[in-house]
């Protein structure tokens, strides 16, 4: 099964993406912050990461 990690701070967007991706048979994991996303990516090794480039805790990493 394909694993997808969504890193997005807006719950409504995460919910929309999760619903669409799970309907296609994908396993979905979520993170609200960049820090949590990095931890989830290292732990779960997703096949695809959908990343919000405007996360508040990611401003200093650009």
Go through each PLM region and give its residues.
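Acidic, metal-coordinating helix/loop segments flanking the phosphotransfer/catalytic sites
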Residues: 5, 30-48
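Acidic catalytic/metal-coordinating carboxylates
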Residues: 33, 59-62
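Two-component/phosphorelay signaling modules centered on CheY-like receiver
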Residues: 11-29
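Active-site residues of response regulator receiver
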Residues: 52
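Conserved acidic carboxylate
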Residues: 8
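Phosphate-coordination loops involved in phosphoryl transfer and adenosine-cofactor binding
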Residues: 1
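The feature encodes the CheY-like receiver
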Residues: 56
């Amino acid at each position: 099964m394909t694993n997808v990690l969504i890193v997005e701070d807006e719950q409504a967007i995460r919910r929309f993406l999760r619903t669409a991706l799970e309907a296609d048979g994908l396993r979905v994991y979520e993170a609200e912050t960049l820090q949590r996303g990095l931890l989830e990516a290292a732990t779960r090794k997703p096949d695809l990461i959908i990343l919000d480039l405007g996360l508040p805790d990611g401003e200093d990493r650009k």
